[in-house]
């Protein structure tokens, strides 16, 4: 990696417009990266290593650091980064007009473990089995390795996921465990995959940048998310593949992509997403609470998401941004404010803000969101299959989701919903969902298999969602109750969809239709 670091520095020095990386395999590693993976596998970071590795003060290694580059195209076709350890393989920070092409990111020791069922004895209870799993030779574990954070059983030949849970787990040796499992259709030969950590650093981190494009990039694995973008403007992903390495049925431990506090246009075009541990994309801003008042117009505010921001960097508004004041219980928007002054306080995980007119006398139960930092999202011609959570999750004020194919996703394929309890906002507006094909999604959970639009809060009665168009989609989910579910939308049009479910195909609750 030293040669690549020198090449980046030379590009900065010379002002070159193209950086060509010689095709081949490159080991990307560091002492902290190897130590982190060893600590996770030994159980030194506890049952949920995210609590240590996903914090603002956690120190980690960075591999290919492009920070500060501008007006550069990096050609990495035929280049494979083989990551040894838990780290951030690629960083794009404070960059402008940068395109990364052709790179593949994978891991020497995968950040998950794979095994196969060698014994499967039925119990008296329906679909409950005594199971023995033999892990692959290159997937040794210890007695304290986290094994039950997120896992999946699947047919080893077809790759079809099976809905099952581990009732009890017993470590046998570094390549075997036994378990009592409840799973429909589990049998000898089925494959078992499990991650050993949730969020950590992303494979590709885009931050504080403008006009960034990833083209023909592949991410096979990562102990965290695939691509994370934060506080950046105009990001395009063209033919991004977040898919397992050949022969595997797991890619990234959590989200394939995740974008927060973005501006401009965010476009995902002809991308492929398979077998990751969460949504294929989640686009949102953050709700923040007023923690201390200085005056009617000056206050300290703090982001309150359970896990912190998704890059573990402070979220804050810029001078001139618009803040929306929202009631947490029903997500009703009460007022808007212009930001006149901001002081960042990263060590205290808050910022001091002055706005253009007074806040209410009491801000108990109220939240502020920066609605200037919401991109227009385009998700066009992508395909997704066999992964956890939702396909698309949108909390923005403008989006087009068109001509995508989604199959066998655990939850609903497309969701537009603010989440008060997770402090991710805002309530969606101006969303068009058109011409998508959705097959057998939402089989594990969700109000509908295909498309869900709602406010996720305690009292969703405020009709804070508006201007929603759902048209010409094909949804086939014969085991699901509903195909489309919309709640609390002021201005919704549902037309021209073909929906095949066992129950009512389209459900609209408390909506005003066009």
Mark where each language-model region is.
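Mature N-terminal segment immediately following signal peptide/propeptide cleavage
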Residues: 1-3
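Extracellular parallel beta-helix/beta-solenoid repeat domains
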Residues: 5-22, 26-514
């Amino acid at each position: 990696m030293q040669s690549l670091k020198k090449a980046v520095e030379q590009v900065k020095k010379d002002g070159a417009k193209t950086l060509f990386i010689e095709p081949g395999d490159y080991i990307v590693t560091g002492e902290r990266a190897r130590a982190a993976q060893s600590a996770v596998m030994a159980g030194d970071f506890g049952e949920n290593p995210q609590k240590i590795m996903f914090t603002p003060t956690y120190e980690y290694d960075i591999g290919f650091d492009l920070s500060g580059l501008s007006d550069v195209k990096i050609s990495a076709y035929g280049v494979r980064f083989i990551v040894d350890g838990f780290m951030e393989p690629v960083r794009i920070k404070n960059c402008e007009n940068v395109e990364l092409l052709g790179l593949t990111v994978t891991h020497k020791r995968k950040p998950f473990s794979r095994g196969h069922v060698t014994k499967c004895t039925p119990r008296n209870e329906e679909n409950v089995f005594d199971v023995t799993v033999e892990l692959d030779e290159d997937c040794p574990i210890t007695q304290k390795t986290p094994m039950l954070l997120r896992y999946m059983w699947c047919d080893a030949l077809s790759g079809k996921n099976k809905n099952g849970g581990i009732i009890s787990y017993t470590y046998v040796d570094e390549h075997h465990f036994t378990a009592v499992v409840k799973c429909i259709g589990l049998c000898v030969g089925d494959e078992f995959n499990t991650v050993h950590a949730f969020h950590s650093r992303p494979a590709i981190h885009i931050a504080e940048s403008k006009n960034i494009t990833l083209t023909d990039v592949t991410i096979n694995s990562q102990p965290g998310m695939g691509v994370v973008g934060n506080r950046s403007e105009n990001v395009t992903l063209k033919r991004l593949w977040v898919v397992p390495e050949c022969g595997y049925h797991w890619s990234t431990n959590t989200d394939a992509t995740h974008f927060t506090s973005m501006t401009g246009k965010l476009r995902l075009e002809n991308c492929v997403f398979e077998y990751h541990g969460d949504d294929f994309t989640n686009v949102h801003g953050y709700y923040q609470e007023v923690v201390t008042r200085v005056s009617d117009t000056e206050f300290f505010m703090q982001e309150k998401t359970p896990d912190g921001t998704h890059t573990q960097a402070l979220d804050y508004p810029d001078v001139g941004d618009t803040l929306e004041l929202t009631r947490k219980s029903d997500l009703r928007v009460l007022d808007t404010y212009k930001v006149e002054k901001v002081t960042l306080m990263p060590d205290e995980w808050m910022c001091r803000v002055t706005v253009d007119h007074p806040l209410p006398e009491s801000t108990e139960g109220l939240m502020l969101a920066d609605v200037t930092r919401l991109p227009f999202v385009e998700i066009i011609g992508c395909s997704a299959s066999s992964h956890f959570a939702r396909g698309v999750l949108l909390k923005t004020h403008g989006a087009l989701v068109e001509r995508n194919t989604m199959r066998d996703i655990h939850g609903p394929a497309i969701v537009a919903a603010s989440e008060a309890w997770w402090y991710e906002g805002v309530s969606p507006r101006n969303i068009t969902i058109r011409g998508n094909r959705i097959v057998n999604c939402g089989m594990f959970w969700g109000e509908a298999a295909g498309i869900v639009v709602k406010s996720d809060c305690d009292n969703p009665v405020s009709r804070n969602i508006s201007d929603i168009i759902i048209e010409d989609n094909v949804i086939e989910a014969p085991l699901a109750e509903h195909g489309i579910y919309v709640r609390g939308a002021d201005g919704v049009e549902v037309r021209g969809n073909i929906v095949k479910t066992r129950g009512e195909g389209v459900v609209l609750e408390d909506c005003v239709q066009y």
